[in-house]
């Protein structure tokens, strides 16, 4: 059955653009150049406004997830990496439920699997672009006209396809790491930096204030006579970034770096060389930032579908159960879910909000921890890091677990790796919720994603660039 499903994508192989894998290893300096060029192209796409927009003043159901999805509203990067991540999530689900079985040992299966994911991402891009345009995000479709509506859809599809190819370029060995992680982490870092150091001023009702928390801190200390009151305002001002959020963000960043050094060291020995011993490390974050990326993609699709359905059928009881959307009382911000399933899946925002609605806090925490653990446990089967895959690597390299027989390697690894993956995913989820409670700049998930991606790039650079200084181990020792 699964073979027939994959074979359906065989005809697309002939005309679907593809990045050819390099015939030999790409030098480190060239990888840096390709990575920089890819990032530059992504940043440019995120600054080019869509041509043909009549109005972009409608509600934005994804405003708190845009940093996570590398999305900039009203630009070519409106959809960000959402279609690509969603496509990956769909195929992960199909594999995890055994509806689709792929032999990673088969070159043909791997190629068809990649083509299938790419086709799915293109279809999702078209669907999301169609929904965004036809629901009036850029003006009423009747005001836009058919030609402009089609042009907007084409622009969104073109930009998303460029991002898809850039990600493929990096993951196939021309650059460093994953394009999706790189683009998302860059967008998050840019967002955090802006909230901390933005020199723009806004009228908050207390007079003009600097938007950036650090700039506002020094400005308030300089102009206010009452320094104590100035400090309190700089650290706890509402509706604008404050210094407490900056400190919370730095704390979360350092704490995640500290946790990167946590690992279970599995003693192994060689069956080929007598007396040769080694350590096989199983990290706490065994699947890195993948669980939180997939969890964010799932949430974004739920919120998008919920708001679209509510706009069309606001009085339907089933739709209202899915989510009731409106502007939060006492604010003039974007529309948010006020009740329904979407409300309970929305990030908490702060410790105060968590205490005011403990039921939502419990449900949201359980949702994040559960989905992250599930995604992490499923991902190891797809990424080639499952107990079966590691046992195969051990056999090929002539390694066994110290004190265990060669025939029991898989059984021992099966006790450790799935548990480590699930626990690591749940830990990522717990850190995300904790960051939200602290009120860190951006969302907890975005800070975790940026930190793990930055550390991942550090590891890749250390490995390929020839320097071996272990920043995190040194940091862990200091702690």
Curated annotation (Swiss-Prot):
Alphabetized UniProt keyword annotations: Endoplasmic reticulum, Membrane, Protein transport, Translocation, Transmembrane, Transmembrane helix, Transport
Cytoplasmic compartment segments: 1-32, 97-118, 167-245, 383-415, 459-479
Protein name: Protein transport protein SEC61 subunit alpha
Segments on the Lumenal face: 54-75, 140-145, 267-361, 435-440
Coiled-coil annotated spans: none
Assembly with partners or alone: Heterotrimeric complex composed of SEC61-alpha, SEC61-beta and SEC61-gamma.
Membrane topology field: Multi-pass membrane protein
Family: Belongs to the SecY/SEC61-alpha family.
Source organism: Candida glabrata (strain ATCC 2001 / BCRC 20586 / JCM 3761 / NBRC 0622 / NRRL Y-65 / CBS 138) (Yeast)
UniProt GO MF annotations: peptide transmembrane transporter activity; protein-transporting ATPase activity; signal sequence binding
Pfam families the record matches: Plug_translocon, SecY
GO BP: misfolded protein transport; post-translational protein targeting to membrane, translocation; retrograde protein transport, ER to cytosol; SRP-dependent cotranslational protein targeting to membrane, translocation
Subcellular location: Endoplasmic reticulum membrane
Cysteine pairings via disulfide bonds: none
InterPro entries documented for this protein: SecY/SEC61-alpha, SecY_CS, SecY_dom_sf, Translocon_Sec61/SecY_plug_dom
Biological role stated in the UniProt entry: Appears to play a crucial role in the insertion of secretory and membrane polypeptides into the ER. It is required for assembly of membrane and secretory proteins and is essential for cell growth. It interacts with other membrane proteins required for protein translocation. Upon binding to SEC62/63 complex, secretory precursor polypeptides may engage SEC61 to begin membrane penetration event. A cycle of assembly and disassembly of SEC62/63 from SEC61 may govern the activity of the translocase.
UniProt-listed PANTHER family: SECY/SEC61-ALPHA FAMILY MEMBER (PTHR10906)
Transmembrane parts of this sequence: 33-53, 76-96, 119-139, 146-166, 246-266, 362-382, 416-434, 441-458
Lineage, opening ranks: Eukaryota, Fungi, Dikarya, Ascomycota, Saccharomycotina
Signal peptide annotation: none
Organism domain of life: Eukaryota
Gene Ontology CC entries for this record: fungal-type vacuole; Sec61 translocon complex
SUPFAM superfamilies for this protein: Preprotein translocase SecY subunit
